[in-house]
């Protein structure tokens, strides 16, 4: 059996494993662990897709067709990655809604780290949406990045810098792919911090009682 007395002496181990939370929590508290499952799924499938993807405006769409048609189990990887992204957002919005309803925002450090995670996730999803370089990808890249031009003085310069030129082109796709590949590792790091902070402070519960009451 697990010796919890010994585990408490190893702070990092106990922080990751032991969550102070009341025994009255419901299904709504499952979505944090479901998000970790989504993150693992997206990282694994994304790695295998990145192996075969070509970040070139003339070849990107063809490389995705190649993945779905010619690569063994490529169609599963592609579909899991696409549907997994949608599930990621379903889970995170339910996770946030539960946090708002039960007052988890009072735990400021955990909440703010979660806000950073949501922002990073939205950025990652946007960059991933552009990668197939279909008609909607081109539209999204143009419209969303054009919002930067609304920034006074610096807007046009920032947009040109992000595009890598005076219009959406090959350099844009290359850097979007690089950002889409790097951001999940930042999300993994931030998730670890989010979990450590949560396990330090303790989770909320439906009755709002102390986390370590039982």
Swiss-Prot record:
Name this polypeptide is given: Cytochrome b
Q: Which GO terms describe its biological process?
A: mitochondrial electron transport, ubiquinol to cytochrome c
| Topological type in the membrane | Multi-pass membrane protein
Please tell me what else the database record remarks about this protein.
Heme 1 (or BL or b562) is low-potential and absorbs at about 562 nm, and heme 2 (or BH or b566) is high-potential and absorbs at about 566 nm.
An example of a GO molecular function for this protein is: ubiquinol-cytochrome-c reductase activity
Against SUPFAM superfamilies, the record matches this protein to: Transmembrane di-heme cytochromes (SSF81342)
Q: What is its main location?
A: mitochondrion
Q: How is the cofactor bound?
A: Binds 2 heme b groups non-covalently.
Q: How does it assemble?
A: The cytochrome bc1 complex contains 3 respiratory subunits (MT-CYB, CYC1 and UQCRFS1), 2 core proteins (UQCRC1 and UQCRC2) and probably 6 low-molecular weight proteins.
Q: Does the keyword Iron apply?
A: yes
InterPro entries attached here?
Cyt_b/b6_N, Cytb/b6-like_sf, Cytochrome_b_N_euk/bac, Di-haem_cyt_TM
Q: Spell out the GO cellular component terms annotated for this protein, sorted alphabetically and separated by semicolons.
A: mitochondrial inner membrane
Please indicate which superkingdom the organism of origin belongs to.
Answer: Eukaryota
Q: Where in the cell is it found?
A: Mitochondrion inner membrane
Positions of disulphide bridges:
none
Query: What's the gene?
Result: MT-CYB
